[in-house]
Amino acid sequence: MKRWEHYEHTADIGIRGYGDSLEEAFEAVAIALFDVIVNVNKVEKKEVREVEVEGEDLESLLYNFLEELLVIHDIEGLVFRDFEVKIEKTEKGYKLKAKAYGEKLDPEKHEPKEEVKAITYHDMKIEKLPDGRWMAQLVPDI
């Protein structure tokens, strides 16, 4: 079961996602990212975007995934509420393919909160927890 949360980090907002699999943790942290931007519970799954990124390690894969979502948000004005992520190991590291579900930003409907300027490696952790679940976290630049 995937879930996400925000956590206190000085003047910033940390985002953290949990999942039964690595993919679910990536999905959950992406939801947490968009919940920093808007109220994701008010976003409907009207449009889908496909994302493909690579990374030499899991940290760069997560960074590239979230950065690509932020680029789509900035260019197309879309906000997302759900994701389907597939990760595979490659000779050069990892490859991620995802579907992102959401709709055009409507300030009246989605209740904009913060502007995320960039994804960062600040406080980034990706780990398998003792209970077998996965956790992914970082602090984006607000």
UniProtKB/Swiss-Prot annotation:
Keywords: Calcium, Metal-binding, tRNA processing. GO terms for molecular function: calcium ion binding. Ca(2+) binds at residues 12, 141-142. Transmembrane segments: none annotated. It comes from the Archaea. Gene3D superfamilies: Archease domain. InterPro entries: Archease, Archease_arc, Archease_dom, Archease_dom_sf. GO terms for biological process: tRNA splicing, via endonucleolytic cleavage and ligation. Activates the tRNA-splicing ligase complex by facilitating the enzymatic turnover of catalytic subunit RtcB. Acts by promoting the guanylylation of RtcB, a key intermediate step in tRNA ligation. Can also alter the NTP specificity of RtcB such that ATP, dGTP or ITP is used efficiently. Chaperone or modulator of proteins involved in DNA or RNA processing. Protects the tRNA (cytosine-5-)-methyltransferase PAB1947 against aggregation and increases its specificity. Belongs to the archease family. PANTHER family: ARCHEASE (PTHR12682), PROTEIN ARCHEASE (PTHR12682:SF11). In solution, exists as a monomer, trimer and hexamer. Oligomeric states form a tripartite complex with tRNA and PAB1947 methyltransferase. This is Protein archease.
